[in-house]
Regions:
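Short, mixed-charge aromatic SLiMs
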Residues: 6-17, 111-113, 170-175
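Glycine-rich anion/phosphate-binding loop at the beta-strand->alpha-helix junction
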Residues: 54-172
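Short alpha-helical "patches" and their helix-cap loops
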Residues: 1-7, 105, 207-211
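Internal helix-turn-beta structural module
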Residues: 155-211
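N-terminal, helix-rich and Lys/Arg-enriched segments in bacterial and organellar proteins
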Residues: 21-24, 82, 130-133, 138, ...
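Glycine-rich, mobile lid/loop segments that gate access to catalytic sites or pores
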Residues: 1-77
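Generic detection of long, well-ordered alpha-helical segments
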Residues: 38, 79, 192-195
Length: 211
């Protein structure tokens, strides 16, 4: 499942890193503006409209969660699951960054805070008490939900006058872009990010016919 996690400085509720229900994923797919919080979604929509009327654009973040991936899918080093997902995700226009699990927040954590402790639940499944690793350890799935976020830059094609150069004459100039351009590509990117995750994970699972 995938949702708009952030537009400009407005943030949606994040996925629960330990458990994402099928019902939640289906509900997001039936929304015209896929956010967990409808109130935040409306605020994002209004902010995009304000940027449009201001002849400007906005960036944002898409969060994706993949559930029911068995432990052991992937490979270490260069053929890791994170590598494969990131490679396809960066093929989506306007992508500028990706993070898995706790992402860049781990830089401010202690090892004792970042480490996800393992345990066996009542039905014998091996799980972790937290999911800072985002469902992938050493390039291989752990059995926990795979969670990652993708940052998209604001659309560069805006109607405001901007400084540029005339390459033919090597002189400075001004450009004003005409026509219809999206003030924010993030809503359109939601199914693209989900498809990228599906392709990357399926390609790894095909290497394991027993799955």
């Amino acid at each position: 499942g995938t949702h708009i996690a952030q537009i400009h400085n407005i943030k949606d509720t994040k996925f629960n890193p330990l458990e994402i229900s099928r019902e939640q994923i289906i509900a997001l797919r039936h929304k015209k503006f896929p956010t967990i919080s409808d109130k935040k979604g409306q605020a994002m929509y209004d902010d995009i409209d304000l940027a449009r009327r201001s002849l400007d654009s906005l960036g944002g973040i898409v969060e994706c969660a993949v559930t029911n991936v068995p432990a052991g899918v992937g490979s270490p080093i260069f053929e890791g699951l994170e590598n494969s997902i990131a490679q396809i995700v960066f093929g989506i226009p306007a992508v500028k960054g990706i993070e898995f699990g706790a992402g860049f927040q781990v830089a401010s954590m202690l090892g004792s805070q970042n480490n996800d402790e393992f345990y066996v639940n009542e039905v014998g499944h091996v799980l972790t008490k937290t999911n800072n690793h985002g469902g992938i350890l050493g390039g291989i799935s752990s059995g926990m939900p795979i969670i990652f976020r993708v940052a998209f830059k604001p659309t560069p094609s805006i109607a405001q006058p901007q400084q540029t150069i005339d390459y033919g004459n090597l002189t400075n100039g001004v450009i004003e872009i005409k026509g219809r351009h999206d003030p924010c590509v993030v809503p359109r990117a939601v199914p693209c990010v989900e498809a990228a995750a599906n392709i990357a994970i399926l390609s790894h699972m095909l290497d394991y016919p027993n799955f």
